Amino acid sequence: MREYLITLLISAALCYLITPIVRAQAIRFGAVAAIRDRDIHSVPTARWGGVAMWASMALTFAIVNHLPLVGKSFGHEAQGIFLASTAIVLLGMADDRFQLDALTKLAGQVFVAGILLIYGIQILWLPINGVITLPPSIGQLVTVLIVLVVINAVNFI
């Protein structure tokens, strides 16, 4: 249990320390949210907050990978999740900087979901009225759909 607490604290500290660096880089590269009538902020706001979170996750993985309990968690599936998160962060950075069109973003999101499927990560059952076990092909479609919905819900916020 102590290793998981250490992992949490390392990740939180790294994110706290990395955020100002990423913010400065976002401003430097022009990845800022312009002021609009519907927004609350009154000055341009730096984007790329996900980059700081991703960087803290990556550094935390590198630091705690050798701990006896936590290190055992980094298998094939964790590599897939890390690769997919890297791809979505890069897509988000490009979108924040260059305002990508909707079709390009959708293609990138489907690509990210495909990475998860390649690494064997998919929804196998749904807890609806008991448990519904899904055939692999339906599970893959549901996985892609849920990944797309979650990415766009987070991006909407």
PLM segments and residue spans:
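"…together with the soluble PPM/PP2C metallo-phosphatase catalytic core" -> "…together
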Residues: M1-I157
